[in-house]
Design a protein with these regions (language model features):
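Conserved acidic, metal-coordinating active-site core of Asp-based
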Residues: 101-163
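Asp-based phosphoryl-transfer active-site loop
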Residues: 2-17
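Conserved residues at the C-terminal ends of beta-strands
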Residues: 8, 65, 153
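A short alpha-helix capping/helix-coil boundary motif
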Residues: 5-8, 28-30, 70-72, 140-143
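Active-site phosphate-binding/coordination module
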Residues: 17, 21-122
């Protein structure tokens, strides 16, 4: 008998349309009724994971940002492993725009998702299923935060590889 089940989101709990199927919803409900603990683990940030949890119709603990942050079923942060400031500062000091004018930096800080440029058009065109978007802040504000995950986004794969 299983004591717990941990599931990823994309391609596991969520189908190709990034939705929870009725079968998945019923399966998770059955696990919980049997007393089996259920957890969601994902590379997404808290808000992205919570959106999927809400669609499932359950309240379960969330492990986010590739395991660097965990939240209880009520959304309280219970664990966080931020990037070390010395390494974070080195990455944030990179002149990433010199690798490609369309490259942007983005990061997860606690339950928040921050970017330094407006991405509404990107999400509207490329990820129309998303209902939650990152908060835009200035590069100066970005450098003041602690992050559990930072990453670069861009259209040109070769530019990102060079970076």
């Amino acid at each position: 008998m299983f004591k717990a089940v941990v599931s990823d989101l994309d391609g596991t709990l969520l189908n190709a349309e990034h939705k929870v199927s009725e079968f998945t919803r019923e399966t998770v409900e059955l696990l919980l009724k049997k007393g089996i603990k259920f957890y969601i683990a994902t590379g997404r940030n808290y808000l992205g994971a919570k959106e999927a949890m809400d669609e499932l119709g359950v309240k379960v603990p969330l492990i986010t940002s590739h395991g660097s942050v965990a939240f209880d079923e009520n959304g309280n942060e219970i664990f966080s492993n931020n990037l070390k400031r010395e390494y974070l500062d080195k990455v944030l000091d990179i002149d990433y725009k010199s690798f490609g004018k369309d490259i942007i930096i983005t990061g997860y800080s606690g339950p928040n998702w921050f970017v330094t440029e407006d991405l509404r058009e990107y999400f509207y065109n490329k990820k129309p299923d998303r209902t939650r978007y990152p908060k835009q802040i200035t590069p100066e504000e970005f450098k003041k935060h602690n992050f559990t995950k930072i990453f670069f986004l861009g259209e040109d794969h070769d530019e990102l590889l060079e970076l």
